[in-house]
Amino acid sequence: MYIYLPIAEISMHIGIIIGLGGAVGFLSGLFGVGGGFLMTPLLIFFGIPPAVAVATEANQIVASSVSGVLAHMRRANVDFKMGSILLVGGVFGSSIGVMLFAFLREAGQIDLVIKLSYVFFLGMIGFLMLLESLRAIMRTRRPGNHKTKLHQHNWLHGLPLKMRFRRSKLYISALLPLAIGAFVGILAAIMGVGGGFIMVPAMIYLLGMPTSVVVGTSLFQIIFVTANVTFLQSVQTQTVDFVLAGLLLLGAVIGAQFGTRAGVLLRGEQLRGLLALMVLAVSIKMGFDLVIRPEHLFSVELLK
């Protein structure tokens, strides 16, 4: 059964939309990411305009993240204090990001910026995460292996305004998570992602949080940051397709529950390795689409 998407102005099969939501929701619960880094490119591949895909995906991420957080809360794997600090920075950053999104859309450059952002950030983060996870797996297989810290203390840990985060067993400056949250918030607005593909590595390698707590805490802040993005996109750019978002939401809520259960079966380094491979695959696909010769060199659209 096909359904017409009013904002995207195309028709898609309901089963495909719900299936995409379920698959990405599963990955959201498994890796602690909003899933936007996969869903937004997938929507673009299926013909959804990039600007609509970005704004709509932010709405769907809220639902899948809520579902994932509830599951992690039952396991006490959420650091609410750390999540709140990240959230403050995220709301500030996402507000700036939406204004930048509107400016680029008016200039006619938003589609190119979205695709280039995916290629650059996903490629860089995916490569670094894969490299580290492979090293961690090799260390665990060596006889007499010992645990190695994923992060090292440096000048960042000497910043002022220090706070104690008991659930994460950290005593660090609040400026660090604030800055990380703001940066991820900007990306959430421009790329239509929850920012988990950057937030999760940053929480592990920069903040030094335990992997078990990172997933739930990441999803917690994603809920509110992407909700802010959805509201601002609806008001300023009118690019949120609520019909598409509702169908994606239906599949995502169910998929996130199964993903959370599956995540318990894997070790931290295995989770990071799988996430890195997913991120790299999307980056390569987006980069390939930018350089290949398009089927139609020119297109004609009616001015509205």
Descriptions of predicted regions:
Residues 21, 25-33, 37, 64-69, ...:
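Transmembrane alpha-helical segments of multi-pass membrane transport proteins and ion-pumping complexes
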Residues 54-65, 87-91, 218-223, 252-253, ...:
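Transmembrane helix-bundle signature of multi-pass membrane transporters/permeases
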Residues 190, 194, 207-210, 214, ...:
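Alpha-helix capping/termination and helix-coil
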